[in-house]
């Protein structure tokens, strides 16, 4: 290893890894022969893995029979889920909900085990955890080596669909909670509210009761754990006190055996305290399955709901021991716990993975009503909800925007007039947003990695929606006077001369994070009719972004930077919020990557500050965590706020340029603004500066300071100056901002030509 300050290099001959600050680059320089040998070895290894996993799983299952099923599941759940919200970092957390689920599924293959040992110690837990992790490592290698097995003859790299299959399976295997719980709760309550009465009569509970029971189960177990911890702490204090009293010759304990106190008194106070803590720690974990499990009556008391509702809920969301297929051994991307995350035995119930419970409500209820007459009503409700919520979120950010829903327009095709629809249209300054919403979800075969179903579902959920938005965009661009009919029958006429940018948005109800963060990788599937890709985002991510955006122009700028990722086609992130977190921290600039020699670039996690913020505002975290935001100086904030508040067209041209500036350029711009304003204040003369930016469009920017001039005269002066300078310099674009130094504010006129 070669270490030099912030640079670390690991060179293993044919494999090289370099860390430069927060960035990690991996490169290989295998010869063709080395590559062929590697593929052949991986292909051979791939064939052996299923049997290896089966053998390990059988041995592991035999080991599990010596434990009480509820106890061992509770221990592994505790180990993998307990976090400190004050210090939690997603990328540092070694536990996994998937480990708990796999253990539970293995236990559910068999009848409930009462166990042969009465106490599960830490060594038992570590061995159990190690066995699970070992099987998951094998499973990961099975899917990593799959392409080598498929291409052991031609040695070709994985195809686009093979890559998407791998990502889909890995996401389904490992990733849980693709949104924040309070957002999901709001979505569930609003989505199923119109069906509450029908649900109540059909399944015995409504959506509000379902959400209350999810909270009730978590609260019941949490309160029990806290109470046991409190008792352990109190006992530690009391027992140590009595040991000290015993040493002084005073022993009047009725609570603890004298033999115990006598033994502890032979130790130093520090050693006695350690011994007591170890013993009470063991007591805390004794019978952990009883703490984690509950009866319907106990849950009814905790949730303050009738026992009939409790039983109906548990009946729908529970699995019994012996219900899992006897052949199950390899961790699967799709499994029954994802829709029925509660297990039961002898009238006691347990939720091994609390993270699954809230997320199971929607797919489980959809399973129940799928083949019912209620399904069509639900589909309509679901689509309307997604459209309404999406437009509301965008409207909350773009406060001065004009927002329209469910528009109709007509196109002539083959001498026929055909009616088409557009889910949403937003007019914001000189920008149009054309929005299509898809409320459906990935099918189970697609989640399992079925190539044909992945292609079919992506086409249905993203490509078809995008084609509809493209059709509307083409209608606007190719029609002299585009006309839309609104839902109330009124007519909207689009004045094309006012718009410089058009964004196409595809919004889904279901997270599609295996595909949408690097949508350009789906182009080779042939599902898109146009090379121009949309911003495809799920409702949960859209909500976070809209809640964290500081001002309207920032959302427009984020869209421009985000869509640039598709154009560059080299960078990739785990999910949309990593892109947004990177934008807030570093601006989402990857223009230099194509010149770097890298053929692939992946972001690490950028959601830590977002997690901290939501933990804090929801009371999970006590330590203050500010809302994540871009570092923007007060002068730039003032410029942007005044431009946005001007009420004049084309201010987005200028705010976008200001946001596009690098830190160095912003510092220079601020310095010159201050200098020229002071000069004009001092001598009363006109002072200005001009800077040039070579971005996608070559732009000249002038800031002019005057004294004693009115706004309209200043605007005319800026326009004349900009037109002249644009012609003289052959720049494609010219922007000018005017400041009257004897008035409040920084922006009193602006032009863009």
Task: Give the location of each predicted region.
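Acidic, metal-dependent phosphodiester-chemistry machinery of nucleic-acid enzymes
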Residues: 1-383, 388, 392-396, 401, ...
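Active-site-proximal structural scaffolding
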Residues: 383, 387, 417-418, 428, ...
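Phosphate-binding active sites in nucleotide-utilizing proteins
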Residues: 383, 394, 403-426
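Beta-sheet entry/capping signal
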Residues: 402, 423-425, 430-434, 501-505
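Short, flexible loop/turn elements at secondary-structure junctions
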Residues: 407-411, 426-428, 439, 506-511
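Active-site beta-strand-loop-beta-strand hairpin of nuclease catalytic cores
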Residues: 426-434, 438-444, 691-701
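A solvent-exposed, charged loop/short amphipathic helix patch at secondary-structure junctions
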Residues: 443-461
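Acidic, metal/cofactor-coordinating or nucleic-acid-engaging core segments within structured domains
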Residues: 458-492
């Amino acid at each position: 290893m070669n270490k030099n300050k912030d640079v670390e290099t690991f060179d293993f001959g044919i494999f090289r890894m370099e860390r430069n600050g927060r960035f990690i680059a991996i490169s290989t320089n295998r010869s063709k022969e080395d590559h062929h040998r590697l593929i052949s070895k991986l292909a051979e290894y791939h064939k052996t893995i299923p049997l290896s996993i089966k053998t390990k799983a059988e041995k592991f299952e035999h080991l599990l029979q010596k434990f009480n099923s509820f106890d061992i599941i509770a221990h592994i759940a505790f180990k993998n889920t307990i976090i400190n919200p004050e210090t939690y970092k997603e990328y540092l957390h070694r536990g996994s909900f998937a480990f708990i689920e796999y253990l539970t599924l293995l236990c559910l293959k068999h009848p409930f085990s009462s166990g042969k040992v009465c106490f599960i110690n830490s060594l038992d837990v570590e061995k159990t955890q190690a066995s699970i992790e070992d099987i998951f490592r094998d499973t990961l290698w099975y899917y990593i080596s799959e392409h080598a097995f498929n291409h052991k003859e031609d040695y070709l790299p994985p195809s686009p669909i093979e890559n998407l299959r791998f990502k889909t399976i890995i996401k389904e295997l490992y990733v849980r909670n693709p949104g924040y719980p309070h957002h999901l709760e709001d979505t569930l309550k609003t989505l199923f509210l119109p069906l509450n009465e029908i649900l109540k009569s059909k399944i015995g509970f409504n959506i509000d009761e379902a959400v209350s029971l999810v909270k009730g189960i978590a609260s019941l177990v949490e309160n029990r754990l806290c109470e046991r911890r409190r008792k352990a702490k109190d006992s530690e204090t009391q027992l140590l006190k009595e040991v000290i009293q015993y040493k002084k010759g005073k022993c009047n304990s009725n609570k603890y055996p004298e033999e115990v106190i006598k033994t502890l008194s032979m130790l130093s106070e520090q050693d006695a305290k350690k011994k007591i803590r170890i013993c009470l720690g063991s007591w805390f974990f004794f019978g952990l399955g009883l703490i984690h499990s509950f009866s319907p009556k106990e849950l009814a008391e905790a949730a303050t709901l009738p026992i009939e509702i409790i039983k109906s809920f548990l009946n729908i969301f529970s699995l019994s021991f012996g219900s899992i297929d006897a052949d199950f051994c390899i961790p699967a991307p799709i499994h029954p716990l994802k829709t029925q995350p509660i297990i039961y035995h002898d009238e006691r119930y347990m939720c091994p993975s609390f993270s699954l419970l809230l997320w199971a409500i929607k797919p489980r209820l959809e399973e129940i009503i799928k083949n019912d007459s209620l399904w069509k009503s639900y589909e309509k409700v679901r689509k309307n909800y997604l459209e309404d919520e999406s437009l509301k979120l965008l409207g909350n950010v773009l406060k001065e925007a004009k927002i329209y829903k469910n528009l109709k327009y007509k196109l002539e095709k083959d001498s026929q007039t055909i009616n088409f629809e557009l889910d949403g249209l937003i007019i914001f300054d000189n920008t149009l947003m054309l929005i299509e919403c898809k409320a459906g979800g990935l099918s189970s075969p697609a989640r399992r990695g079925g190539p044909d179903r992945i292609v079919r579902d992506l086409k249905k959920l993203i490509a078809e929606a995008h084609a509809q938005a493209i059709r509307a965009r083409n209608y606007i661009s190719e029609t002299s006077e585009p006309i839309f009919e609104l839902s109330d029958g009124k007519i909207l006429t689009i004045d094309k001369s006012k718009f410089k940018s058009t964004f196409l948005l595809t919004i889904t109800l279901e997270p599609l994070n295996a595909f949408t963060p690097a949508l350009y990788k789906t182009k080779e599937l042939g599902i898109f009719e146009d090379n121009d890709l949309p911003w495809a985002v799920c409702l949960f991510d859209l909500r976070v972004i809209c809640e964290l955006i500081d001002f309207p122009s920032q959302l427009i700028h984020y869209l421009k930077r985000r869509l640039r990722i598709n154009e560059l086609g080299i960078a990739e992130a785990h999910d949309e919020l990593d892109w947004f977190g990177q934008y807030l921290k570093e601006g989402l600039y990857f223009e230099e990557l194509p010149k770097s020699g890298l053929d692939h670039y992946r972001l690490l996690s950028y959601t830590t500050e977002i997690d901290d913020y939501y933990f804090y505002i929801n009371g999970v975290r006590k330590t203050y965590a500010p809302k994540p935001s871009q570092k923007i100086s007060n002068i730039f904030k003032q410029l942007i706020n005044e431009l946005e508040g001007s009420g004049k067209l084309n201010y987005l041209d200028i705010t976008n340029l200001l946001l596009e500036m690098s830190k160095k350029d912003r510092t220079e711009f601020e310095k010159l603004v201050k200098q020229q304003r002071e000069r004009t204040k001092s001598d009363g003369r006109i002072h200005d500066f001009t800077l040039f930016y070579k971005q996608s469009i070559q732009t000249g920017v002038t800031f002019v300071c005057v004294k004693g001039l009115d706004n309209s005269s200043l605007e005319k002066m800026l326009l004349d100056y900009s037109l002249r300078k644009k012609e003289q310099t052959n720049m494609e674009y010219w922007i000018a901002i005017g400041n009257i130094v004897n008035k409040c504010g920084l922006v009193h006129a602006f032009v863009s030509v």
